[in-house]
Amino acid sequence: MAEAAPAPTSEWDSECLTSLQPLPLPTPPAANEAHLQTAAISLWTVVAAVQAIERKVEIHSRRLLHLEGRTGTAEKKLASCEKTVTELGNQLEGKWAVLGTLLQEYGLLQRRLENLENLLRNRNFWILRLPPGIKGDIPKVPVAFDDVSIYFSTPEWEKLEEWQKELYKNIMKGNYESLISMDYAINQPDVLSQIQPEGEHNTEDQAGPEESEIPTDPSEEPGISTSDILSWIKQEEEPQVGAPPESKESDVYKSTYADEELVIKAEGLARSSLCPEVPVPFSSPPAAAKDAFSDVAFKSQQSTSMTPFGRPATDLPEASEGQVTFTQLGSYPLPPPVGEQVFSCHHCGKNLSQDMLLTHQCSHATEHPLPCAQCPKHFTPQADLSSTSQDHASETPPTCPHCARTFTHPSRLTYHLRVHNSTERPFPCPDCPKRFADQARLTSHRRAHASERPFRCAQCGRSFSLKISLLLHQRGHAQERPFSCPQCGIDFNGHSALIRHQMIHTGERPYPCTDCSKSFMRKEHLLNHRRLHTGERPFSCPHCGKSFIRKHHLMKHQRIHTGERPYPCSYCGRSFRYKQTLKDHLRSGHNGGCGGDSDPSGQPPNPPGPLITGLETSGLGVNTEGLETNQWYGEGSGGGVL
């Protein structure tokens, strides 16, 4: 029994040992291998798709760059077209203005021509016959009121008979009425005011064509009428003068009186009569007229005493019996002989053809060489400017209701009001929201966007976008300051600078801030102040990204990055970034000589080393020598530190 028991134990042990042996690993199935192959194929498909997409993106990028280039070219062409349209518009405006002026002058000439035709029909004016012009053109010879007037001295006037005095009065009155009939607002000549009887009006109604003859007192000899005088003048001249046949058409005779150009129709005359030294021969008039003019009238040609009409008797050359001379025509250039195609303007001396001379001389009709200093009007040399100045002195100067500025003329106030009223600025800038009152200001403003500076200073090379800026700059080179303050005597190179300076004396601050109670003298100061309320800082540093309110603050800040030191000390040679720092240095270190803080050798210090790239400049001006810091990047105007 004892031997039989161990046998089952050994069997159990062998079974346990066999159960404890490790099981064999399972072999991978074929399905897993197929899955791996499929995943690899899918990965290569995705890579190929990504590469195809990248190629498409690259193609689209190239097309986009090409389109951007074409867009830039189109924008340049569009800008060029806009510039051309603007230039054409300006030229068209100028042409329209010239056309309007020509139409006005044409209407004025038409009215004068109608008046002259009425004048000739009334026969109440002395008419000088002029030769026909080349190609039938109209000649012009200037003649004033005095050219057809005769003045007597006091002894000569007393020797005249009553009928001779009456004849003289009627002739002078006829000349004056002729000027009045041509719409000339002229004062009555002194000769008429003194010879006119008391109780008689200065001007009388003009006689009609039937009543145009000059009445004379009865005397032993028959009276002389205007028709008789015209009959003498209209007679044909002697053939020995060699004049060409007279033109049947009337010629225009251009004269001046009180600086107003006057067109008078006249009939043809021999060319020799235009010479200031050769008298004009006429056929002998009747005996009464012969005695009146040869014995009395032409005696005054040698008299130099004052006439009873307040005028000196001019020296006239002697004329033989039956001849009349017009010496005052000698002060004007005469038309050239027949055959010459060039004519000279007696106003400016230009040489023009005869058909162009008429149009050219119309431009002189509006010339007024004497401008009024207080208003845009111009006056002729004969006009009395003293009365106009007195009128300005008694007037209240026009004042702007918005800024209280005063102006010398209402038209300038009207133009100034456009500054306050933005709706009256019809010219907007296409590059910014600004608007302007006229095209010239818009053109000047657009040069700032285009960085165009066409006006260059010949002395220093600086360029300017405005011509007035160049002129003011050149006054600085010439030390010219023509505008002086009457209160403190300080001189300025421009009128606008003087006006801004005078606001200091008057306390005027026409630009108030709507957000606070502050007011400013200049508009740009108000704009800079408004940025404090809005938080706007439009000027950014390209190196560190710091933003500033004003442009000159940015320029000062950039000296830190560039190492620029534009303010050298004349004593020790040290240079400073800011002008205020140089002033502080001069006050502290130089009292008649170089201070202890300067280089004893008197040589300028070594140039600054490389800039510190990691310098923190947010809000503070850093002193690299450890002296102090100063907040100047904001609104303050103090200088920075070395």
Swiss-Prot record:
User: Which parts of the sequence are annotated with region: Disordered?
Assistant: 1-24, 198-225, 587-615
Q: Tell me the keywords, alphabetical order.
A: Activator, DNA-binding, Isopeptide bond, Metal-binding, Nucleus, Repeat, Transcription, Transcription regulation, Ubl conjugation, Zinc, Zinc-finger
Give the sites of the cross-link named Glycyl lysine isopeptide (Lys-Gly) (interchain with G-Cter in SUMO2). K265
GO BP term (any one): regulation of DNA-templated transcription
One GO CC term of this entry? nucleus
Please list the residue ranges that the record marks as compositionally biased, kind Acidic residues: 207-220
> Locate the KRAB domain: which residues?
143-214
Q: Which InterPro entries match?
A: aKRAB, KRAB, KRAB_dom_sf, Znf_C2H2_sf, Znf_C2H2_type
Which parts of this protein are zinc fingers (C2H2-type)?
343-364, 370-392, 398-420, 427-449, 455-477, 483-505, 511-533, 539-561, 567-590
Q: In terms of one coarse class, where is the protein primarily found? A: nucleus
| Localization in the cell | Nucleus
| Induction line | By estrogen receptor alpha.
- GO molecular function, a single term: zinc ion binding
Q: According to its UniProt entry, what is the function of this protein?
A: Functions as a transcriptional activator.
UniProt record similarity statement: Belongs to the krueppel C2H2-type zinc-finger protein family.
PANTHER family linked to this entry: ZINC FINGER PROTEIN, ZINC FINGER PROTEIN 398
The protein's name is: Zinc finger protein 398
Record organism: Homo sapiens (Human)
